[in-house]
C-alpha cells in the first residue's frame, strides 16, 4: 500500500492514469515483454511521495478538478521514475524494489531509451497544462536534477566536500523536485485551470 492510500487518496484512479499514460504507445513496442517489464518497474512503485505532495497541496484549494490534479501527480511520478531508471544505469544497480533493472534485463542503450520514453510521457502530460510559467519550472527542475547528478559524479569519493556543496547537491537532486511537487498547484493560472 502506498502513501496515497494511507492518506485517503484514490490510489486506483492514480494507478489507472499512470498505466494509461505509459501504455498508450504500447503498440509501438515490438517487444511486448519489454513493455511489460517497463510497466512492472513503473507500477511496482515506491512510496509515491512526490504525487502525495501534489495531492496534499491541492487539498488547500477548494473545488479542485480531480482528473487535472491527478494528471499532474502522475506526470510528477513519471518524471521521478525516469530519473530512477537513469540513476540505476549510472549507479550500475541490478535491482530496484526487488525487480531486475531495465538496463540489466536488456542493455544500457535500451535502459537509457526507456528512461527517456518515460520522461517523454511525463512531459506529454505536463503539456496538457497550457501554462508557460509551469513549463519553465519543469525545465528548472530537470536542469537541477541533471546538475545535481553531475555534481555528485564530479565529487564521487571527495571526502573534503563542504557541507554547503553537499546541501546544494541535495537541493538540486531532491529538494527542488519536492518543492515543485508541493507548489505546482499554486500558479494563479493553474488555480483557474483546476477550478
Q: Can you describe what each PLM-predicted range is?
A:
Residues 25-28, 43-47, 129-195:
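All-alpha helical catalytic cores of prenyl diphosphate-utilizing isoprenoid enzymes
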Residues 96-119, 160-174:
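Divalent-cation-assisted or electrostatically stabilized phosphate/pyrophosphate-binding catalytic cores
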Residues 53, 122, 148:
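Residue-level signal for inorganic ion chemistry
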Residues 1-79, 85, 89-104, 140, ...:
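Conserved N-terminal diphosphate/IPP-binding helix and adjacent helical/loop segment
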Residues 49-50, 74-77, 110-118, 173-181:
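Catalytic-loop motifs flanking and including active-site residues across diverse enzymes
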Residues 81, 125, 184:
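Short alpha-helical functional segments enriched in proximate histidine and acidic residues
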Residues 117-133:
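Primarily interfacial, aromatic-capped hydrophobic alpha-helices that serve as membrane anchors
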Amino acid at each position: 500500500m502506498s502513501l496515497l492510500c494511507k492518506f485517503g487518496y484514490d490510489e486506483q484512479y492514480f494507478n489507472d492514469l499512470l498505466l494509461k499514460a505509459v501504455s498508450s504507445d504500447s503498440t509501438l513496442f515490438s517487444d511486448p515483454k519489454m513493455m511489460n517489464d517497463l510497466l512492472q518497474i513503473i507500477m511496482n512503485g515506491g512510496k509515491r511521495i512526490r504525487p502525495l505532495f501534489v495531492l496534499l497541496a491541492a487539498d488547500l484549494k477548494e473545488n479542485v478538478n480531480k482528473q487535472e490534479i491527478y494528471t499532474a501527480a502522475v506526470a510528477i511520478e513519471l518524471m521521478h521514475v525516469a530519473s530512477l531508471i537513469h540513476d540505476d544505469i549510472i549507479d550500475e544497480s541490478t535491482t530496484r524494489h526487488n525487480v531486475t533493472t531495465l538496463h540489466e534485463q536488456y542493455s544500457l542503450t535500451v535502459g537509457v531509451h526507456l528512461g527517456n520514453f518515460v520522461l517523454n510521457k511525463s512531459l506529454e502530460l505536463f503539456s496538457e497544462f497550457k501554462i508557460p510559467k509551469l513549463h519553465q519550472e519543469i525545465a528548472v527542475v530537470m536542469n537541477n536534477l541533471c546538475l545535481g547528478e553531475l555534481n555528485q559524479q564530479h565529487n564521487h569519493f571527495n571526502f573534503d566536500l563542504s557541507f554547503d556543496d553537499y546541501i546544494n547537491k541535495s537541493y538540486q537532486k531532491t529538494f527542488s523536485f519536492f518543492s515543485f511537487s508541493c507548489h505546482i498547484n499554486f500558479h494563479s493560472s493553474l488555480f483557474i485551470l483546476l477550478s
